From Swiss-Prot:
GO biological process: cAMP-mediated signaling; response to caffeine; sorocarp development
Alphabetical keyword list: cAMP, cAMP-binding, Cell membrane, Coiled coil, Glycoprotein, Hydrolase, Membrane, Metal-binding, Nucleotide-binding, Signal, Transmembrane, Transmembrane helix
Membrane topology note: Multi-pass membrane protein
E.C. number(s) listed in UniProt: 3.1.4.53
Gene designation: Pde4
Pfam families according to UniProt: PDEase_I
The organism's taxonomic lineage, starting at the top: Eukaryota, Amoebozoa, Evosea, Eumycetozoa, Dictyostelia
EC class (word): hydrolase
Listed name of the protein: 3',5'-cyclic-AMP phosphodiesterase 4
Length: 1039
């Protein structure tokens, strides 16, 4: 039994030692080295008992592969090869006993039912069955024999995949034990594409049919054409029946070899018949030689084994058949009178045996010629096959080299840029001689090896931020941010609290608004539809048209005059302005249904995340598009950005993702704590988009709808604050790879005077007094814009407003904003400013443009600090109010209150300052650097930040004063307390002195009493002694 590695070694050895197609000498194979992994067989005698079986099976399969191999040579080769293999195996079996049950199971699983073509040597197959039934151990050896034979049968495939097997055998050496060995016994077996017997075989049956038909035509035309009138047409029927019977009888044979040999040998029967009846016409010699040559030509195409032997046999049979026909004719044609019923009329010319002998010798010579021709054809075919094989080898080698060249030229580069950087740094370390440089490079590799390349390294232990800021930042990012000063005891307390509060209020899991608890129906929309003002309201017209290109768009005023529906009107305006209704086949009714459902899904009870915030984000995003990069976007990208802004906070429950995770809500479980609310917004919005009455994407093709959906998903998911730093880091890397074209050209006075978006630099001064100037300038520019636009807006319908806006400010072109009208007040500025960030878009691909779109919607979403102070304070108050509502819910659920969300510990200014410094200012700094037309936004941030810092300083001063006052009060109280303590101490001392005096008096009195008692006792004792003495004297006197 051998594994794959051993088979490959034996195959390679045989191929290398057999370049000329000679029989391989197996004694040259070193089984000690090539069969080192063989396992021992349980009973070595079984191998000796099955040598005959091996010989028979090998012979059968070799005959199948190359039927023209000499039988004697094969028998000698088989006997020698089996003996050598058995001897080698016996030596190995005596040294090793590694045959296990696993190997037995694997061997028993080998398929023993593969078909083998039988031939002359199959008579010994019954011996194999007898040996298998006598001893169960022989099953393993028989399995080996069959595998041995099957490998010989499939040696063509093994040769074709020789290189692959050699490469894969080392990998599979430890996994598979294949009990087989492959032998290569001839040059044709050595070739990778061997031409087998089937491909060398001609259409034998068809050629026999042609042969019979030809002589049939000869019979049918001999008498009619008078070239042989003695051949009667009456012979046509018996000859035809004879040929048909032979051809049909040949179809009954199931064995392919018999179906080839049978028609060749049975062709002697029609020949005998034709030879006999063509004797009278003296054409039998021509017919015999023609028939004989035709049969030999067919024989050469038969491809049967031992072709020469069959040619000799056929020649002998044919000559005997011809001689018998001559003898039969000499016996049969003897009737001279025509009266004998069973004899033929005597021949016109008698048979001359010398002439017949000459014909037989000619047939023998013709047979020898065909034998030599067969040998030559075979040698020539072998030579052609070898040349063809060599050509194929060269062709495959050429293709292999060409493939390697193509791979080297067009190799798929699977190395990431960071891997290439690491390789470059490692090579620099290896070539560097300075130890200091090596240490620095190693440090760089360690930094690059981090899995958070685009996230800042928060180290609160090295900065002045407190634990409250850390907790707030952690809740914003939904992950640990590196704060190391958190007490572990607090974490343990949180775990205990979570274990005690396992039941969470269902109100925290399900949305609290009625709009979230059930699906919107038409009846739910009726109150909103009735409460919406008329679309012909002049105030709505003027407000949108005059301010949609202003950064300080009065979104709260729009909400008031639209009765809480600002998103509907702003979306309607932008859809008409960008011609989305025509480009994306959106019906007006479908759009209205869609927008009413979307705006109804924004909970008006949320102080911040409501339709006003969605309108503000939509306006901000459109402002970025029209002021800068709109012309670089495709229609699909522009449409996707507008839709993403509309639905980005759809059905927001008023709490953040951190709350969802801590409360173990249904949404957190559904979305696996990853971008929970963002996924929820998308899911609910796409449900509405798929409804028939509100499906604004249903009329688009599948490919366009798929692209819009993918873009919307990417944009809405990018609004997750947990992805903020990664997104900013990627934008930095991408933007730094493009040259930044900063426009320093100032607009002319005429253009600046007519521009409604030009903001004087005085409005950016970060002082509290700058608000007045900002308001004044904004009012002036707004008034100018109103005057320009009111001259062109005369209709009272929203469609006329849209058309009027398109004519006055320009409509978006096929690729974005294209302000083409000469009355547009922003042309002179926007044309110059659009060049600033154009290099990024001009040199970017679709992936980079998607990153830019993500940054733009991110900036639009957190743009509150970039607004003027009056708008910013309104937004910050709303955010704080929503934070406090979340804190109240956390208290109701016995959860830890998040940072800056406890209304009992207000810290709005501190929260806003940290939000600006950590999130808003860095991204707007990069945004305005690459798009200078947005520097107003960044400088508003700096202005608001300075005011917040002033407020914080004032608050700190107030706190310090209060602390000082409190300290003074505490000091006064401490002094009074000290005085009181001193007085109390003095009083206590007096009391102690008086008490001591009193104790001394008591002790003195007590001592006097003791003395008096002692005196009295002494007196009493003396009196008693005197009385006793008198008593004794009296007694003595009596006595």
């Amino acid at each position: 039994m051998f594994n794959n590695n051993n088979n490959d070694k034996i195959n390679n050895t045989m191929m290398s030692n057999n370049p000329s197609g000679q029989i391989i000498n197996l004694e040259s194979i070193d089984c000690n080295s090539n069969l080192s992994n063989t396992t021992s067989i349980k009973d070595s005698n079984n191998n000796n008992n099955n040598n005959n079986n091996n010989n028979n099976n090998i012979n059968n399969n070799i005959n199948k592969i190359n039927p023209n191999i000499d039988r004697k040579v094969l028998d000698d080769f088989n006997s020698k090869s089996i003996k050598i293999i058995d001897n080698k195996l016996n030596k190995k079996n005596s040294k090793k006993n590694l045959y296990s049950k696993e190997v037995d199971d694997d061997i028993n699983k080998i398929n023993l039912n593969k078909k083998i073509i039988p031939n002359e040597t199959n008579s010994n197959n019954s011996n194999n069955n007898n040996n298998n039934s006598n001893n169960n151990n022989n099953n393993n050896n028989n399995n080996n024999n069959f595998n041995y034979n099957n490998n010989i049968n499939s040696n063509n495939n093994i040769i074709n995949n020789n290189n692959n097997i050699n490469n894969n055998s080392n990998n599979n050496n430890n996994n598979n034990n294949n009990n087989s060995i492959s032998l290569y016994v001839d040059t044709q077996e050595k070739s990778k594409k061997k031409v087998n017997a089937e491909s060398l075989r001609g259409p034998i049956i068809f050629q026999n049919f042609i042969l019979y038909t030809f002589f049939l035509i000869v019979i049918g035309t001999a008498e009619g054409t008078s070239w042989a009138p003695e051949i009667r047409v009456a012979n046509f029927v018996p000859y035809c029946v004879m040929c048909v019977v032979l051809l049909e009888f040949n179809r009954l044979h199931k064995k392919p070899l018999l179906r080839i040999i049978f028609p060749l040998y049975t062709s002697n029967i029609p020949f005998a018949y034709m030879c006999i009846f063509s004797r009278e016409a003296r054409k039998y010699v021509l017919i015999s030689l023609l028939f004989f040559a035709s049969c030999l030509c067919i024989f050469l195409q038969s491809g049967i084994p031992d072709l020469r032997k069959h040619i000799v046999i056929f020649c002998i049979i044919f000559m005997i058949n011809y001689g018998c026909c001559i003898l039969f004719m000499d016996w049969f044609y003897i009737d001279t009178t025509g009266t004998k019923p069973y004899r033929g009329r005597i021949l016109a010319t008698k048979i001359h045996w010398g002439e017949e002998a000459t014909i037989l010798v000619s047939m023998a010579l013709l047979g020898c010629i065909f034998i030599v021709l067969e040998k030559f054809i075979k040698s020539y075919a072998r030579c052609v096959a070898e040349q063809h094989y060599q050509i194929q080898c060269l062709q495959k080698e050429k293709e292999k080299l060409q493939t390697e060249i193509n791979i080297s030229l067009k190799k798929l580069d699977l190395d990431t840029p960071i891997e290439k950087i690491m390789d470059i740094l490692r090579s620099m370390i290896n070539t560097s001689e300075s130890e200091n440089d090596k240490k620095q490079l190693i440090k760089v590799i360690a930094v690059l090896g981090s899995n958070k390349l685009y996230d800042p390294d928060f180290k609160f232990e090295t900065c002045t931020d407190d634990a409250e800021v850390y907790s707030w930042l952690q809740s914003m990012l939904n992950r640990e941010v590196g704060y190391s000063n958190v007490n572990n005891n607090n974490n343990m307390m949180m775990i205990e609290n979570n274990n005690n509060n396992t039941i969470i209020n269902n109100n925290l899991i399900e949305p609290t608004s009625p709009n979230f608890s059930k699906k919107l129906t038409s009846s739910d929309l009726i109150p909103r539809i009735r409460s919406m003002p008329e679309i012909t309201d002049q105030g709505i017209q003027e407000l949108i048209i005059n301010n949609f290109l202003e950064w300080d768009f009065p979104v709260f005023q729009l909400s008031e005059i639209t009765d809480g529906n600002p998103l509907f009107y702003m979306s309607y305006f932008l859809f008409s302005r960008h011609k989305f209704f025509e480009k994306f086949k959106i019906g007006i009714d479908c759009f209205k249904n869609f927008m009413r459902k979307i705006e109804s899904g924004y909970d008006s009870t949320n102080p911040y995340h409501n339709s006003i915030h969605a309108t503000d984000v939509l306006h901000n995003l459109n402002y970025f598009i029209e002021k800068s990069f709109g012309k670089f976007l495709t229609d699909i990208e522009l449409f996707s950005m507008i839709l993403a802004a509309i639905i980005h906070d759809f059905k927001h429950p008023g709490v953040n993702n951190h709350f969802q995770i801590n409360s173990k809500s249904r949404l957190a479980l559904k979305y696996n704590d990853k971008s929970i609310l963002e996924n929820y917004h998308l899911h609910q919005a796409f449900i509405i988009m798929n409804e028939p009455e509100s499906g604004i994407l249903l009329k688009l093709s599948d490919s366009v709808r798929k692209e819009i959906r993918e873009t919307i998903i990417a944009l809405v998911l990018s609004t997750d604050m947990a992805k903020h730093f990664n997104l900013v880091g990627r934008f930095k890397s991408m933007a730094n790879s493009f040259p930044t074209t900063t426009n320093t050209q100032q607009p002319s006075s005429s253009s600046s005077s007519s521009s409604s978006t030009t903001i004087p630099t005085s409005t950016i001064t970060p002082t509290p007094n700058s608000t007045t100037s900002t308001t004044t300038t904004t009012t002036t520019t707004t008034t100018t814009t109103n005057n320009n636009n009111n001259n062109n807006s005369n209709n009272n319908s929203l469609n006329n407003i849209i058309n009027n806006c398109s004519s006055s400010n320009g409509s978006m072109g096929a690729s974005g904003a294209d302000n083409s009208n000469s009355n547009n007040t922003n042309n002179s500025n926007s044309n110059n400013q659009n060049q600033c960030g154009s290099s990024i878009f001009l040199n970017s691909n679709k992936k980079d443009r998607l990153l830019l779109m993500k940054i733009s919607i991110k900036c639009a979403d957190i743009s509150n600090p970039s607004k003027p102070w009056n708008l910013y304070t309104n937004w910050s108050n709303r955010v704080t109010s929503e934070f406090y509502k979340q804190g109240d819910k956390e208290k109701e659920s016995n959860m830890d209150v998040s940072a800056f969300m406890d209304r009992n510990k207000p810290a709005t200014t501190k929260c806003q300052i940290n939000f600006i410094n950590i999130f808003v200012a860095p991204i707007y700094e990069i945004w305005s650097h690459h798009f200078p037309q947005f520097k107003l936004c960044y400088q508003n941030i700096l202005s608001n930040l300075s005011r917040l810092e002033i407020e914080q300083q004032q608050q700190l001063q107030l706190q310090q004063q209060q602390q000082q006052q409190l300290q003074q009060q505490q000091q006064q109280q401490q002094q009074i307390h000290q005085q009181q303590q001193q007085q109390l101490h003095h009083h206590q001392q007096q009391q102690q002195f008086q008490h001591q005096q009193h104790q001394q008096q008591l002790q003195h009195q007590h001592q006097q009493q003791l003395n008096n008692q002692n005196q009295n006792q002494n007196q009493s004792n003396s009196n008693n002694s005197n009385s006793f003495g008198l008593t004794q004297s009296n007694y003595l006197i009596v006595v």
